């Protein structure tokens, strides 16, 4: 056997790519040579065998041994004579020959398939016309050696024709190439090349592509589109003649580079160039695959002419290529590895450019030979081969990855190149930035799309609402859980409040701030402000005081409408008049004011600002009137419709909820505060009120869909007629799931705050949804009197399919930014296509689709939206940089794991900090400071300290290199054993979206929570064909412990999780005891595992039924004593005080939205039975658990919960607090904090020292996984102190 050789040059990459690919023939290369003339086929067949025998790489065998791949020359391999096939009598000789060759290529031709890696056929299709088919595996040849072998066979054939001996082999043994390559890898030259490419990478611009699909995450494909562009009409030749000082190859390259740059909308980009890697090397005459594709930056100036571009490219590229050739032996794969890029990351380059210098001409007397390429191996994006010929013409062959391109698009792109050449032929002095890439007819197409002119009346919101109220005075207009107003009654309330505003000094043109919870009074307040001629300024009471103060300082409203409990938050805002409003007013019978004018500002909404300060967007009456009239025309409401108001008033989508129903005679129903965050609450809300029209942010739609079963969808969604989505990209798969579950029509809307809510629309159901090919539904077509423009960097329109910057025009544009004329001027610019008009740059990147709709592709800056909330990462960065001892700070949005993913946008904010002093930062304390300044949706869920921020090759921040927060076991243990442990580990992985290779991996530390525990139990029950309960998952939450239980006796473990002691985690240090809430179960505390340091044990204390302390005790003191007897414990209302009385140390006492029993009337609650809200909460939990376990949950659990709730009320009727002389930490649920309730006052008689952390959630959510994202780190920091 010959010497075993390692794989070298391109071979390792080819081997690995084939192993990872599921395509059977991706790495085969093939062409056929069309021979016209008299051919001696048997003699040519002999020449083929002789020629193949001279190239030793064609006799290579490959084997894998202990992870290493070896190759050797099989000297015993004998090539058979190629088959000669005569198709002259066939009906379609050419088609049949093509089918034969393609059939060969469609076989499994992988290197280990057993099929020949080398294959030739001679197919006669006519007298004196042959197809010589040749196919090789890419491990044996490359694009240089393939034609070289063909030429050598032709030489042998000619010698045989002349009766001469077979010419000697011109090919170098591949062993010489391997030896030389190994020496190179160990040489200083390799080190110099590595250093050269490190520096090259630093200067390299980003890659570009003609496809809108991202380059990252896409693999090469052997499914390829081929397009040959022939420029034989003389225009390239004419241009070359006019530019006589420019080489034809340089001109061809300049035209192609400019064409790519303009169609990519990127004038600086990285392209791939093919290097032979043979000159001065043993590989010069070897046949193995040694070609290299290396990155090179292309730089185009918009203000230069084509001759200047060609000359500069030629000069610069010549110098650059000369340097690169000295370092061309360095593997492209090694450059990628050196850059730190992982598989699936963005590649170094997109399109590959290749000016063909390989000689495909065959010198056979009396025979013309033309080569036709069939397969060249996989293509990542585009490969362009340029063929400038000796006649002065140009042809370009395009190979395109079919996963990224379609044939009509490629043909259009080819037409644009022809048009580009024609423009330069007509005017060689034309600037590169001014050349037109729009095809004839495309301007008219875009003009037709934007032909949205519709005459609308000159009116205002208040006038439209008053007009409808006069038509249907007795129809129901506005309702919440407590009130119902007819149109007449609502109008009377609005006028009464508007007059009160006037009395308080509000004048037309003023602004009025509103800080009210969601109720009928919020709607009435907004309408009254408009009635008084003012603009409303919504204040989200969930925002920190500092941020609200900034908004008020900038807006300077003439009045604040709020409630008594919120008023203290604004006490330090100077010169702010206030009005507390939470009850109906007595109608005065006054005439309507209707002081608004069409030119007035209707509302001011603050959005995130990159400067670190929020910016107020002012939207006028005419803009929002246009938006509402369009919506009523396009999606008409009637008096039978019920519209849900569930969007927070600080989000501009709420505007149409507050006003659209009242211009159409429909009814608006107000969801309870924060109900929009609870899918089960929304199900009940829709069903109770018969809602027909509602809105979801896509991520909340995903959560709502996840909560539905076919049965609950029929119950809660049956009345829905139209559902709207906006605020984020809308996943097409989510729409399909919604359609299958509910059948309710879904509509995608798009628009920034700066353009009256929405400016475009697209159906997200039915036939339109079926035609969506991308991952997201298009943002669609413009609304009335509005235009969409997609422009390149030179402000030229881009053609369909080409990515560009999205601009908005028309009547709906905002008036500007409050008090920021500089920012207004920079974002609302003059419209170059409509003199005297304005245009707003959205910062969104988009493209036109063939049907005229717009597809959103992403952002061109650091702004993003998460669950509909606009976020400027720069604003968070600046606030973090102001924190103590922080030198550098950056924010990144990422999916931490899949446990929280619901099919929508699962990204969360992570903050990265670099310390000024180099000392460890107290990230929990810093996070608490951020909550005092930033609204909840802008506070990173976790802060990570880094020694330094990662930089990309060009010295910029490399966001992709920022580490993800690790939610995993602290130290690796043994691997799961085959059997139960392996099955359980796989179940963990599938539910949590992370790799589980440790038998001690904890389900909750990895991101699980109680609902996911339900799903896990249901899944394992099916897999093991025995009942696995959620309680067992709670108690035995690691892979190994759960396997032990499942493999043990079923009866003995069934009560696990339902006992008094709930061991949630075992550590080697102190223990945190978690007392059950009124439900009697402590399962919700399972998520604490992911926040507390590993030495902490976590134990839940429960009250199961029957015989639990809550059921058997006559008063709360007995419950406390019973639990104290079970374990030394800390808990309000007695346990902590009892421990102190016994002389025990209480290191930490935590209270989760807990209040002294003396602050409420528990006797009245007991007399009235279980609170409806409590029953609703239990029902929501039941529905969620049933959905998680697919209906298999026992009713016993919820019977116990209901019993415990009733007992809790009974026990609290006689309970009395006991003073505690230590320190406690109280977490207050702000959203359900009763008016006038002060936690400081309520607890001051009973607790000596109290730390209070206000949480942006409701009481029912205080122990939810979402709440523990904020609470968990605070508990950890407190315990560590």
Swiss-Prot record:
InterPro entries: AA_adenyl_dom, AB_hydrolase_fold, ACP-like_sf, AMP-bd_C_sf, AMP-binding_CS, AMP-dep_synth/lig_dom, CAT-like_dom_sf, Condensatn. GO terms for molecular function: 2,3-dihydroxybenzoate-serine ligase activity; ATP binding; nucleotidyltransferase activity; phosphopantetheine binding. Gene3D superfamilies: 3.30.300.30, 3.40.50.980, alpha/beta hydrolase, Chloramphenicol acetyltransferase-like domain, Luciferase, Domain 3, Nonribosomal peptide synthetase, condensation domain. Residues 1070-1281 are annotated as: Thioesterase. It is an enzyme of class 6 (ligase). It catalyses: 3 2,3-dihydroxybenzoate + 3 L-serine + 6 ATP = enterobactin + 6 AMP + 6 diphosphate + 4 H(+); holo-[peptidyl-carrier protein] + L-serine + ATP = L-seryl-[peptidyl-carrier protein] + AMP + diphosphate. Pfam families: AMP-binding, Condensation, PP-binding, Thioesterase. Residues 1-301 are annotated as: Elongation/condensation. Binds 1 phosphopantetheine covalently. The keyword Manganese does not apply. The active site is at 1259 (proton acceptor). Pathway: Siderophore biosynthesis; enterobactin biosynthesis. The keyword Ligase applies. SUPFAM superfamilies: Acetyl-CoA synthetase-like (SSF56801), ACP-like (SSF47336), alpha/beta-Hydrolases (SSF53474), CoA-dependent acyltransferases (SSF52777). Residues 975-1050 form the Carrier domain. Residues 486-891 are annotated as: Adenylation. Its cofactor is pantetheine 4'-phosphate. 4'-phosphopantetheine is transferred from CoA to a specific serine of apo-EntF by EntD. Holo-EntF so formed is then acylated with seryl-AMP. It is found in: Cytoplasm. The modification O-(pantetheine 4'-phosphoryl)serine is found at residue 1010. NCBIfam families: AA-adenyl-dom, PRK10252.1. Involved in the biosynthesis of the siderophore enterobactin (enterochelin), which is a macrocyclic trimeric lactone of N-(2,3-dihydroxybenzoyl)-serine. EntF catalyzes the activation of L-serine via ATP-dependent PPi exchange reaction to form seryladenylate. Activated L-serine is loaded onto the peptidyl carrier domain via a thioester linkage to the phosphopanthetheine moiety, forming seryl-S-Ppant-EntF. Proteins EntB, EntD, EntE and EntF are the component of the enterobactin synthase. Components probably do not form a stable complex. EntF acts as a catalytic monomer. Belongs to the ATP-dependent AMP-binding enzyme family. EntF subfamily. This is Enterobactin synthase component F. The lineage of its organism: Bacteria, Pseudomonadati, Pseudomonadota, Gammaproteobacteria, Enterobacterales. The gene is entF.
